[in-house]
Amino acid sequence: MRFEGRVYYDFSPQVWRFYRFLAAVGKKGADLRLDWRSFLADDDPQSAAGLALVESVRRNHPDRHGAFLQALLALRHLEDADLTDPRTAAAAAEAAGLADVIEPSPDAVTASTEEGRALGVTGTPTIHRHGPVLRVEVNPAAYEGDLLERLSRIDAVLEDDGIWVLEKPG
């Protein structure tokens, strides 16, 4: 199954859960073609710092962008690393194979957030392909069962512009 779109993200726990779900479906054979875009909805210093670092890597080292994002997400959520600490940026850069010091790019975060808001993004994680955006939050049960079928359901809702809101209590 091919799954594509633009994912608006920050460094929140719900984005980490969604990222882990996507990693799991990728291991099951899904062809993921996702463009990860910064979205700063709240006054969250951790997300603001992390997003500014990732945007700098996107601009200056686009081929290492994904590896750097993955490293920062893991450092934040597996090691509770402080994304405002330059040592965290250095560790993520090393993990991503970057020798440069990463200078934050907060203006790019602002531009990406404004782009997302114009599309209707109000929180993260949100996917945009065409038409209305789809906010997707998964719980730990998302990693069990038929993951590709679950991804197919998400894809079907994303494609159906007649569905605007589906909610199921967590």
Indicate residue ranges for each PLM-predicted region.
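Structural alpha/beta surface segment adjacent to cysteine/selenocysteine redox centers
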Residues: 2-87, 164-165
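C-terminal cap of thioredoxin/glutaredoxin-like
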Residues: 19-22, 82-170
